[in-house]
């Protein structure tokens, strides 16, 4: 029922080590990407259109082919108008997905899921150790995030394929066909024993191909030999699948319109569902915030 939901399963073992660092830290320098489903491109575009009226905080070139960056302080009337537009956006989301969920999500954590989970855990610990009046307005109650539009042209979803080595290729493919496939459905390509075969997955509404395949592989590899790896690029996949006792599964890219419905209906996405951008395009740690 949360308005903000994780796109990947939180590994609870990762939280305590992060808490040790954050709980006594005076500042946070996180990178949490919060994706909004602004198909009308009205929310962040409002800031872009008005940045000429804002105070520029920084502008410089980034290292390691990272390009150029500039930042403005959103303040005053423009900030108030932006907050109003956020409220309008959330109402639009409630209307858009009312038939899918009684409590639709408004934002998806696209990156930094564990950073955000750690921030929440630290604040919950503060609440246990202090009276409410001392923590109600504590700086650590809030986390710094970067809001991005899922539908922005700069957001490119790229598929992450699967290769299984050290396995009986024929048996894996036959079991996959038996348990997950039919005459029609979402196409995937399988490479094994120097062959290429197109299969059709039986998916329920809003289910992703990667969800079906990953669930199958997790169960199959509990009982059968094989090691799974996650591969970018079709050419590399085919090369690896040409090995003896190997299977390559080429998955389709997830459409942007699939993200929110999939998380609302099936929960967190399988690991390595998609990739957003290349290494040189990733965000740099620039903004920070006091948390104590």
Regions found by a protein language model. Name each.
Residues 1-292:
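Surface-exposed, charge/polar-rich loops and edge strands
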């Amino acid at each position: 029922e949360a308005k903000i939901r994780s796109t990947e399963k939180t590994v609870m073992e990762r939280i305590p080590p992060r808490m040790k660092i954050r709980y006594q830290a005076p500042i946070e320098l996180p990178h949490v990407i919060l994706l909004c489903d602004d198909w009308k491109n009205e929310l962040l575009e409002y800031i872009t259109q008005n940045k000429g009226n804002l105070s520029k905080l920084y502008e410089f070139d980034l290292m390691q082919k990272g390009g150029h960056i500039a930042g403005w302080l959103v303040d005053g009337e423009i900030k108030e108008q932006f907050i109003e537009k956020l409220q309008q956006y959330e109402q639009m989301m409630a209307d858009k997905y009312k038939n899918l969920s009684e409590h639709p999500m408004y934002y998806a954590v696209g990156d930094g899921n564990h950073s955000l989970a750690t921030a929440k855990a630290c604040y919950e610990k503060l609440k246990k150790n202090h009276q409410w009046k001392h923590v109600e307005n504590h700086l650590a109650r809030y986390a710094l995030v970067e809001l991005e539009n899922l539908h922005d042209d700069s957001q490119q979803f790229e598929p992450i394929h699967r290769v299984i080595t050290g396995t009986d290729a024929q048996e894996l493919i036959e079991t996959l066909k038996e348990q997950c496939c039919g005459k029609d459905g979402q196409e995937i390509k399988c490479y094994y024993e120097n062959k290429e075969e197109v299969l059709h997955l039986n998916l329920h509404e809003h289910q992703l191909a990667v969800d079906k395949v990953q669930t199958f592989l997790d169960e199959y590899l509990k009982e059968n030999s094989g090691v799974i790896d996650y591969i970018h690029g079709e050419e590399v996949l085919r090369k690896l699948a040409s090995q003896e006792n190997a299977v390559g599964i080429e998955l389709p890219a997830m459409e942007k319109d699939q993200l929110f419905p999939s998380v609302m209906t099936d929960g967190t996405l399988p690991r390595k569902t998609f990739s957003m951008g290349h290494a040189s395009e990733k965000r740099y740690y620039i903004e920070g915030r006091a948390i104590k």
